[in-house]
C-alpha cells in the first residue's frame, strides 16, 4: 500500500515535468465518434471538414487551393498529393464502407437517431469527383485546358441526387479505375465487354468527321479519274505521232515493195480496191482489172 501511495504520485509528477520540457509534436488531432449501423456493427462517424460546402465545387475548391489574382493558381504538388491521399482514405470504396461521414450540412448532435450521413453511392460519387479533380490538377495539359476553356471537368457535383446517371460518368480517374475500365473488368461475358467497346466507339464518332471522310474519299476518287484521263490523252497523242511517222517511212519505202513508178501505182490500186470491196470475188475481179490497166500503161510507154 505504501508503494502505491508514494511511488505512483512521484512518477506522475516526474512525467508531467518531462512533458512540459519536451512537448510532443502533434500534427493532427481528430475526435471521432462511433455509431452502430443497421447490423449492429460499430463504425467511425466523422465530419469531413476539408470538403467544400459549395453546391458545385471546382477542382480548386475540392483541394482548398485559393485562386491567385492572375486566374492561374499556384499548386504545391506535395500538399496536393497529401490531401488526395487523405480523401482516398475516407472515400475509397475499400474504406468508405467502414466509415460514416456527415454530409456538408452542419450537424449539431451526432447521437441523433437520423444523422445526415452520406450514403454509399454519395461517397463513391465524391471519390470519383476527387479523382477527376486530382487528375486535372496533376496533368499540366489538362489543367491549362480547364483554366482556359473550363473543359475536362464533366462531373458536376450535386449532393443528395441520383449519382448513378450518365452525367456523372467520366474517364481517366487517377489512382483508381475509371468508369470505362470498371465496366470492362466487371462485364459478365466477352460479349458484354465487346458491346461496351462498340458503344464507346459509336459515342466517339462525330458526324462532321464522317462527312469529312466521305468528302475526302470523293476528292481522291475524282482526282484519280482526272489523272487517268490526262495520262490517257498524253498516251494517245504520243501514239498518233509515232503512228504517223511510221506510215510516212513506209510510204517512202513503198511498204516493202519495189519503189518504181508502176509498183507504187499497183500498191495504190490495191489499197483502193481493199477499201472499196470486201468479198473475195470482188477483190479478184478488181485485181484483174488493175493488172490490165497497168499492162496498158506499160505498153503505152
Swiss-Prot record:
Keyword Chaperone among record annotations: yes
A GO term from the CC aspect: mitochondrial inner membrane
Major localization class: mitochondrion
Subcellular location: Mitochondrion membrane
Membrane topology listed for this record: Single-pass membrane protein
InterPro entries (alphabetical): DjlA_DnaK_co-chaperone (IPR050817), DnaJ_domain (IPR001623), DnaJ_domain_CS (IPR018253), J_dom_sf (IPR036869)
Domain J intervals: 58-150
Disulfide bonds, paired cysteine numbers: none
Matching Gene3D superfamilies: DnaJ domain
Coiled-coil region list: none
Transmembrane segments: 208-228
Keyword line: Chaperone, Membrane, Mitochondrion, Transmembrane, Transmembrane helix
Keyword Chaperone: yes
Top-level lineage group: Eukaryota
Task performed by this protein: Probable chaperone.
UniProt miscellaneous comment: Present with 414 molecules/cell in log phase SD medium.
Homology family: Belongs to the DnaJ family.
Entry protein name: J domain-containing protein 1
Species assigned in the record: Saccharomyces cerevisiae (strain ATCC 204508 / S288c)
Amino acid at each position: 500500500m505504501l508503494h502505491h501511495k508514494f511511488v505512483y504520485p512521484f512518477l506522475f509528477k516526474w512525467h508531467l515535468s518531462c512533458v512540459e520540457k519536451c512537448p510532443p509534436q502533434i500534427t493532427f488531432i481528430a475526435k471521432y465518434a462511433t455509431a452502430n449501423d443497421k447490423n449492429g456493427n460499430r463504425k467511425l462517424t466523422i465530419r469531413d471538414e476539408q470538403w467544400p460546402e459549395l453546391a458545385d465545387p471546382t477542382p480548386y475548391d475540392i483541394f482548398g487551393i485559393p485562386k491567385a489574382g492572375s486566374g492561374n493558381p499556384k499548386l504545391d504538388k506535395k500538399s496536393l498529393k497529401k490531401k488526395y491521399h487523405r480523401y482516398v482514405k475516407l472515400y475509397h470504396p475499400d474504406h468508405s464502407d467502414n466509415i460514416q461521414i456527415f454530409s456538408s450540412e452542419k450537424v449539431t448532435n451526432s447521437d441523433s437517431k437520423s444523422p445526415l450521413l452520406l450514403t454509399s453511392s454519395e461517397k463513391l460519387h465524391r471519390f470519383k469527383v476527387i479523382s477527376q479533380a486530382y487528375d486535372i490538377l496533376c496533368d499540366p495539359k489538362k489543367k491549362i485546358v480547364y483554366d482556359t476553356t473550363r473543359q475536362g471537368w464533366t462531373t458536376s457535383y450535386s449532393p443528395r441526387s441520383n449519382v448513378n446517371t450518365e452525367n456523372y460518368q467520366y474517364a481517366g480517374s487517377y489512382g483508381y479505375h475509371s468508369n470505362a475500365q470498371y465496366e470492362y473488368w466487371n462485364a459478365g461475358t466477352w460479349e458484354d465487354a465487346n458491346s461496351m467497346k462498340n458503344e464507346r466507339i459509336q459515342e466517339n464518332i462525330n458526324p462532321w468527321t464522317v462527312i469529312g471522310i466521305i468528302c475526302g474519299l470523293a476528292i481522291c476518287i475524282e482526282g484519280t479519274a482526272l489523272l487517268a484521263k490526262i495520262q490517257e490523252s498524253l498516251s494517245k497523242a504520243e501514239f498518233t505521232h509515232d503512228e504517223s511517222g511510221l506510215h510516212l517511212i513506209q510510204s517512202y519505202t513503198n511498204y516493202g515493195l519495189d519503189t518504181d513508178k508502176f509498183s507504187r501505182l499497183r500498191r495504190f490500186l490495191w489499197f483502193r480496191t481493199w477499201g472499196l470491196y470486201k468479198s473475195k470475188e470482188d477483190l479478184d475481179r478488181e485485181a484483174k482489172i488493175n493488172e490490165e490497166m497497168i499492162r496498158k500503161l506499160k505498153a503505152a510507154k
